[in-house]
């Protein structure tokens, strides 16, 4: 293994289909996705797309609790999303009360996670503004979002 200690060179998730539960090891974070220490943006996006293809009510247990900061970034990436604003406000309240924001579910992630919404006009417009031109593909949108998230304060 190379890269940072504790990070594998594959993007994976474990799925217990009969119970509708996913234990996410690397690709997904509630409202976001992990950094790319190894592998490629294409591999991470493919992994996230497999996760997003699961049934709406599939529960996702993420390995890390970064929901509030991820949703702060998501709001910057898609500022016009009312659903995202509601989710973010709820996550802030939950965190302040000491309540975990995970598990989440696939429907919520599809509706509010910018890394699963690279084909949405609002996300593409934000990325176009950052690039100074429209992104040419879903993978370019995803890659720019992930690079921006790395720098986001």
Which stretches of residues belong to each language-model region?
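Catalytic core of the metallo-beta-lactamase
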Residues: 1-78, 146-149
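Accessory terminal helices/loops
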Residues: 46-59, 68-153
């Amino acid at each position: 293994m190379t890269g940072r200690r504790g990070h594998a060179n594959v993007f994976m998730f474990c799925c217990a289909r009969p119970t509708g539960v996913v234990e996410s090891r690397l690709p997904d974070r509630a409202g976001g996705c992990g950094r790319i220490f190894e592998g490629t943006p294409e591999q991470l996006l493919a992994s996230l797309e497999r996760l997003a293809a699961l049934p709406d009510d599939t529960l996702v247990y993420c390995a890390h609790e970064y929901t509030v900061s991820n949703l702060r970034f998501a709001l910057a990436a898609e500022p016009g999303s009312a659903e995202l604003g509601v989710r973010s406000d709820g996550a802030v309240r939950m965190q302040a009360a000491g309540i975990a924001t995970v598990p989440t579910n696939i429907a919520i992630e599809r509706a509010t996670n910018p890394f699963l919404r690279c084909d949405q006009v609002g996300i593409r417009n934000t990325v176009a503004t950052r690039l100074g031109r429209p992104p040419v593909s879903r993978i370019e949108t995803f890659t720019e979002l992930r690079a921006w998230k790395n720098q986001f304060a």
